[in-house]
Amino acid sequence: MNIDDLSATIAELDSAAIQQAQQRQDQLTKPQGALGLLETLSIQLAGITQQCPPSVQKPIIVVAAADHGVAEYGVSAYPSSVTAQMVANFLAGGAAVSVLARHVGAELLIIDAGVQTAIVSEAANFRSEWLGAGTHNLAIEPAMSQAQAQSAFERGIRIAHELADAGHDLIALGEMGIGNTTAAACLTAIYCQQPAAAVTGHGTGVQAEHYQRKIEVVAQAVARVGSNVDGLQPLIEVGGFEIGILAGIIVGAAQRRVPILVDGFITTAAALVAQALAPKAIDYCIAAHCGAEPGHRIALQQLGLRPLLELDLRLGEGSGAALAIPLVQAACRILSEMATFASAHVDTAL
């Protein structure tokens, strides 16, 4: 894979479909713009899919899980063993994203990108893309090798193409990994040129001296790497295996004109990686929500994405993306099913 040529593999949004969707929105029985972000979203979806009206019938939530060496520094309120335990919980159907996926009628795919103890499961909705027993400690050394970073990214692209081939027309992103808000904070600090304190939150609930320690770790990692890095280098230095796979999924989905629902802080950090490698991929992204992590809003602003929801979520897993799936479907149905002024015999504005 030549990452220098990635943007050439992603088409611009379809201008004819966008124009058709805008014209139809303006003819529907409502004041122009009265449905706010739902109108904007429906037009974006038309441009992504080259269809007016667009349709989302087979959404899937993809949760990538991996461990992080930086967890040994006490940056999380939970031990690394929780990553594998939560993967088991996902597969058993007991996690928040499991419940929400059932609620919104979405399929759920769990990926082991690099859990400390490799997951063994025969579950139909599980796949192993194991890249190692977690990353190295990003505070003191590169989190992964160049080969691991490239493999993670390429695997993500391949997964997205397989999902598109299976008929999935919306890919929602989720993640699990103790220590991964620290990796996300480091990536956000580098890509957005922000100080550690501005992008580092409480994650799983670290408080007081542990929170200050987390800020120090992020600052230490960013200082080690420096700001003059591009391409895959930030992922190599301070990323995570799950973040690399998710970044690849974003690019692969964009190549196939499949819209992507970005979830919380970690998946948004993956979008920053994707943006650095293939800027046009972000045109295919929808921000499900803005969560409680301070770096999340900064990253969304860098990406130019406006969140659909603000619920103070800080769970990850794809929970916010799951909640946004019905909004995406609603945007499609409004454009498809609402009457026009002419068809409903309603007078237009004076």
From Swiss-Prot:
Any Pfam family the entry gives: DBI_PRT
Keyword Transferase: yes
Enzyme active site: 317
Keywords of this entry: Cobalamin biosynthesis, Glycosyltransferase, Transferase
UniProt superkingdom: Bacteria
Catalytic activity annotation: 5,6-dimethylbenzimidazole + nicotinate beta-D-ribonucleotide = alpha-ribazole 5'-phosphate + nicotinate + H(+)
Family: Belongs to the CobT family.
PANTHER family from the UniProt entry: NICOTINATE-NUCLEOTIDE--DIMETHYLBENZIMIDAZOLE PHOSPHORIBOSYLTRANSFERASE
Role played: Catalyzes the synthesis of alpha-ribazole-5'-phosphate from nicotinate mononucleotide (NAMN) and 5,6-dimethylbenzimidazole (DMB).
Protein name: Nicotinate-nucleotide--dimethylbenzimidazole phosphoribosyltransferase
Lineage, top ranks: Bacteria, Bacillati, Chloroflexota, Chloroflexia, Herpetosiphonales
